[in-house]
Structures are given as C-alpha cells and as structure tokens.
Amino acid sequence: MTAGRARFMMGSSRQESTPVNRIEHIALMANYNQWMNRKLYDAASTLTETQLAADRNAFFGSILGTLNHLTLGDTVWLKRFAQHPAGFAALVPLSSLAMPVDLKQVAFGTLRELSDRRAWLYQLIIDWAHSLREPDLDHRLHYHTMRGMAADKPFFSLLVHFFNHQTHHRGQATTLLTQAGVDVGDTDLLAIID
C-alpha cells in the first residue's frame, strides 16, 4: 500500500470482479477517514481561528463546531466499540477519556487542539480496523444511546454507520470550507483505490 492509498483487488480483467470482504471494506473506510481528515484539517488551517469559529448557520454552527462534532461522535462510538467481547487492544487508550455528553459542544477551542486529537483518533481507528477479524463483525453490540436508552445492534452495521456518519459530516465541513473560499480538493473515495 502506498502512502495515503489503499489497494483493494476487485478481480482480474479475465474474471468477473469479486466483492471486497467486510474486513477489507472497514480497512478501506479507515484509510479514507484518515486521508479525508488530513485534507480537511490542511484546508481548515488556511483560515484564521476567527474564521473557523464564525457562525455559518450550519447545524453545528461553525467549521470548528462541525469538526468538533465529528471528533466527539467518533469518540462516543469508539468507546462503545471498546465494550465489544473481543476486547480490542487498540481501543484501550480510550478508557482514559470521558464519554462526551453533548455532541454539539466545542470541546476543542482551537484547530491545533482539535487537530492533535483528530490525528491521535485516526491512527487509533486504523490500528483498530486492522485488528478486526471476520467473526468480530457478527456480534451484536449492547450500548446506550446519548439519551440513555438501551440499544442492541449488529456490530458490522454499527461500523457502517460509524464511517457513514463521518462521511456525512465531512461533507458538511467541506461545504462550509468551500463557502469560506477554501478548496478541499478531491474528496472521492475512488482517489485512494488502486
């Protein structure tokens, strides 16, 4: 795998393509997550802290608010995933973090603080994604929602939601950056697939 690019074989030119298995899909999404977050933070770093914190009438207010939401949301889900019966060693460092209680809070007041946490998180996500095994995906995960309601969902479906949530809010952040005059560049998943 080249830096920032993932290699996923989809079959040869002589045979019908074969589907990517679930573990490969998760690894691809973890790599895409890291690549896109780096692009977003590089783009955001061209703005001042005042521009980043400016209310843009977005769901999370500002660019900084949207990026904070992504980081807090990832933290919530990863802490839930740490309760999986497999006891993922890559997620143990999360035990020192408090569970976020408000996904709209600006927990990190500067891009530098947020960027440091984000870099730590996306490396943790990659390490964890590469530690997953196929049988891990077939469990149901018991957790509590942000409102305290008990929930029980298929683990693989929760992973799909986790990465989809990131993509959704990165799209919002990309729009806010574009409106602020910053070009994030190519954001397509295809850009990292060989």
Where are these regions (language model features)?
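Short, Lys/Arg-enriched N-terminal segments with co-localized hydrophobic residues
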Residues: 4-19
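Short, charged, low-complexity loops and linkers
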Residues: 19-29, 104
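Residue-level recognition of alpha-helical structural elements
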Residues: 22, 52, 59, 107-110, ...
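Short, contiguous alpha-helical
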Residues: 27-42, 46-100, 144-194
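Helix-adjacent hinge/juxtasegments
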Residues: 86-132
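Acidic catalytic patch
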Residues: 131-146
